[in-house]
UniProtKB/Swiss-Prot annotation:
SMART domains: RING. It comes from Homo sapiens. Its main location: cytoplasm. GO terms for biological process: cell differentiation; spermatogenesis. One of its GO terms (molecular function) is identical protein binding. This is RING finger protein 151.
């Protein structure tokens, strides 16, 4: 892609001295070599990146010797150019340096419709008319903040409470399957907890009974031991001598 301005952009053919020998367009940001030949800055820097000689006279050139031609740039900036929308009907001509300013206000410049959801691009001069008939432009959000997008007919019968209630109902219906699933899981966990609690109670009772049995056995043995000893002593005691009559 060339670095200069398209020749067809100008209202009248430019002087040949203003034409770049590399891209054959009108000089953009002109730069001069030590040999006095002038080129677009972009064109000559690309050239010197591949070759170290002037494109015209083939003399050796060093990149640091390239000089910017600011006065020539201003001269070219005063040349009259056509509007980029000339084919669409714009007949305005203006200095090259002012081309951007005209483009920002040109009634033939294509402009995107600002209405949300509309992808149309229309000439700036007809934008106001387009917005009056734009289907997307006729839709607006509820000014009370419920979030509904309404056209003129809907705005006349719109009820925020009803819209919010309907939205809430839809959300509840979407949540119902999840809530039912969670409820079934809670019930299952409650049943499982009851079973575990009952088994723990039975285990606790069993341990208490077992502990009581273990604690009662030594006491019974201790109480039985003295009775046995007394009996032994009685049996083993010698009999008293009974005098004979």
């Amino acid at each position: 892609m060339g670095g200069g301005y398209d020749l067809n952009l100008f209202a009248s053919p430019p002087d040949s001295n203003f034409v770049c020998s590399v891209c054959h367009g009108v000089l953009k940001r002109p730069a001069r070599l030590p040999c006095s030949h002038i080129f677009c800055k972009k064109c000559i820097l690309r050239w010197l990146a591949r070759q170290k000689t002037c494109p015209c006279c083939r003399k050796e050139v060093k990149r640091k010797k390239v000089v910017h031609m600011n006065k020539l740039r201003k001269t070219i900036g005063r040349l009259e150019v056509k509007c980029k929308n000339a084919d669409a009907g714009c007949i305005v001509t203006c200095p090259l340096a002012h081309r951007k300013g005209h483009q920002d206000s040109c009634p033939f410049e294509l402009t995107a419709c600002p209405n949300e959801g509309c992808t149309s691009q229309v000439p700036r001069g007809t934008l106001a008319e387009h917005r009056q008939h734009c289907q997307q432009g006729s839709q607006q959000r509820c000014p009370l903040g419920c979030g509904a997008t309404l056209d003129p007919a809907e705005r006349a019968r719109h009820n925020c409470y009803r819209e919010l209630h309907n939205a809430w109902s839809v959300r509840q219906e979407r949540r119902r399957p999840l809530l039912l699933s969670l409820l079934r899981r809670v019930r299952w966990l409650d049943q499982a907890t009851s079973v575990v609690r009952r088994e723990l109670a039975e285990l606790s009772n069993f341990l208490e009974e077992d502990t009581a049995l273990l604690e009662g056995a030594p006491q019974e043995e201790a109480e039985a031991a003295p009775e046995g000893n007394v009996g032994a002593e009685v049996v083993g005691e010698p009999r008293a001598n009974i005098p004979c009559k």
